[in-house]
From Swiss-Prot:
In the N-terminal section; belongs to the purine/pyrimidine phosphoribosyltransferase family. In the C-terminal section; belongs to the OMP decarboxylase family. Bifunctional enzyme catalyzing the last two steps of de novo pyrimidine biosynthesis, orotate phosphoribosyltransferase (OPRT), which converts orotate to orotidine-5'-monophosphate (OMP), and orotidine-5'-monophosphate decarboxylase (ODC), the terminal enzymatic reaction that decarboxylates OMP to uridine monophosphate (UMP). GO terms for molecular function: orotate phosphoribosyltransferase activity; orotidine-5'-phosphate decarboxylase activity. One of its GO terms (cellular component) is nucleus. The active site is at K314 (for ompdecase activity), D317 (for ompdecase activity). Orotidine 5'-phosphate binds at S257, K281, K314, D317, T321, S372, Q430, Q431, Y432, G450, R451. Keywords: Decarboxylase, Glycosyltransferase, Lyase, Multifunctional enzyme, Phosphoprotein, Pyrimidine biosynthesis, Transferase. Its EC number is 2.4.2.10, 4.1.1.23. This is Uridine 5'-monophosphate synthase. It catalyses: orotidine 5'-phosphate + diphosphate = orotate + 5-phospho-alpha-D-ribose 1-diphosphate; orotidine 5'-phosphate + H(+) = UMP + CO2. Residues 221-481 are annotated as: OMPdecase. Pathway: Pyrimidine metabolism; UMP biosynthesis via de novo pathway; UMP from orotate: step 1/2; Pyrimidine metabolism; UMP biosynthesis via de novo pathway; UMP from orotate: step 2/2.
């Protein structure tokens, strides 16, 4: 049952006035450019408005006749809404974490859980329904029943149908169409803007699986942002912006994996292939003659040829230990490496430890979300945990080592190892994919190539072949509409 228009109209208008609803041109986390942007986070600083929104959400649940024992807000914007609802109406609340903490109870759901009881999910905005489903799945794993979700605004992009296909009824206080109608009547927006928003919504609907179990029709891909455009996004890390700009300028998304054992060869590779690459990946612990002077020379070459240095250290210990490994010891990695990487197995402490050293030096980190070796355990929930950790520490983490795109946020970079011009593998379990497969089909940004170049008779010629193949795959991906 819809909320009475006399209550809805003033609420929509006030939300517009406090800039919860914005119109213009905005880049969404999917990379799409949208004429409307909805951001309700600011209402936490407006207690009266926060209470109004919470009350209208609760009334919507009552009007729908929903029976429930507890309430859980989708993190993070819906958490304060759920808190106000539960406090005002004396209802038990559950809090869902985005990731398990490495201390305390280590639980994903906090609060008194009674398996078999029904939990009502609260959300601020629904687009595809994915965030609601993630919360539903976590609650169901705790033995709770979830049948309904209440949302303030349904963007009408397929989320309701997607949730319905999973047995979840979505009840919206307001739809995007209703919001547009109210704001146009109040002369907050004109007919042209209403038309632009409606066209955008119609062209970007997320399809749910059919009830007969068949997969949804293939959705037409939308043109994504170029490297240059991604560099200018307000949420892009400064070092990621630098990398994206030099990639655009040099027309290269090739990272050379310089796994050599002699410093002289490392420097020769950097000098000869520097113009063809955007990054040079090192394994300094395999250099027989490592010195900090060598790294000083490498840093000078990186500056001359405009590429970044990525030390493939794969940190995987507790925070205090990785901090020391990064900052001191024989290699003093933080003093010369622009970027390092880390496993997520130890929990967020590994990032926090690296961050304490790297942030003041304007360094950055990649998280290992997937690996190119046969039998890798970096899949499924492990990959999801890596994405969640990156989002939580985006001031230091700039992306992932992965076999494909694992996050739709254009601010994050994806680097893929195990690339050769021909697919295949080696006797130690390394699996190879082509640049077209990795960049064009799997949505990665940068290919990491080692043996395909190092084993070639003419390394510069081989590097140029990989550079061109990867860049052409990127351009082809941009051209898809």
């Amino acid at each position: 049952m819809e909320v009475a228009s006399q209550a809805l109209g003033p609420l929509v208008t006030e939300l517009y006035d406090v800039q919860a609803f914005k119109f213009g041109s905005f880049v969404l986390k999917s990379g799409l450019s949208s004429p409307v942007y909805i951001d309700l986070r600011g209402i936490v600083s407006r207690p009266r408005l926060l209470s109004q929104v919470a009350d209208i959400l609760f009334q919507t649940a009552k009007n729908a006749g929903i029976s429930f024992d507890s309430v859980c807000g989708v993190p993070y914007t819906a958490l304060p809404l759920a808190t106000v609802i539960c406090s005002a109406n004396h209802i038990p609340m559950l809090i869902r974490r985005k990731e398990t903490k490495d201390y305390g109870t280590k639980r994903l759901v906090e609060g008194e859980i009674n398996p078999g009881q029904t939990c009502l999910v609260i959300e601020d905005v629904v687009t595809s329904g994915a965030s609601v489903l993630e919360t539903v799945e976590v609650l169901q794993k705790e033995g709770l029943k979830v049948t309904d979700a209440i949302v303030l605004l349904d963007r009408e992009q397929g989320g309701k149908d997607k949730l319905q296909a999973q047995g979840i009824r979505l009840h919206a206080v307001c739809t995007l169409s209703q919001m547009l109608e109210i704001l146009q009547q109040q002369e907050k927006i004109d007919a042209d803007m209403v038309g632009r928003v409606k066209r955008f919504i119609q062209e970007n609907v997320f399809s749910a699986a059919n009830h007969n179990g068949l997969p949804p029709p293939e959705k037409k891909a939308c043109k994504e942002l170029s490297f240059g455009a991604r560099a200018e996004l307000p949420g892009t890390h400064p070092l990621a912006s630098k990398l994206l700009r030099l990639m655009q300028k040099k027309e290269t998304n090739l990272c050379l994996s310089a796994d050599v054992s002699e410093a002289r060869e490392l420097l020769q590779l950097a000098d000869a292939l520097g113009p063809s690459i955007c990054m040079l990946k090192t394994h300094v612990d395999i250099l027989n003659d490592f010195t900090l002077d060598v790294m000083e020379e490498l840093t000078a070459l990186a500056k001359r040829h405009e590429f970044l240095i990525f030390e493939d250290r794969k940190f995987a210990d507790i925070g205090n230990t990785v901090k020391k490994q990064y900052e001191s010891g024989t290699f003093k990695i933080a003093s010369w490496a622009d970027i390092v990487n880390a496993h997520v197995v130890p929990g967020s402490g590994v990032v926090k430890g690296l961050q304490e050293v790297g942030l003041p030096l304007h360094r950055a980190c990649l998280l290992i979300a997937e690996m190119s070796s046969a039998g890798s355990l970096a899949t499924g929930n492990y990959t999801k945990a890596a994405v969640g950790m990156a989002e939580e520490h985006c001031e230091f983490v700039i992306g992932f080592i992965s076999g494909s795109r694992v996050s739709m946020k254009p601010e994050f970079l994806h680097l893929t190892p195990g690339v050769q011009l021909e697919t295949g593998g080696d006797h130690l379990g390394q699996q190879y994919n082509s640049p077209q497969e990795v960049i064009g089909k799997r949505g990665s940004d940068v290919i990491i190539v080692g043996r395909g170049i190092l084993a070639a008779a003419n390394r510069l010629e081989a590097a140029e072949m990989y550079r061109k193949a990867a860049w052409e795959a990127y351009l082809s991906r941009l051209a898809v509409q």
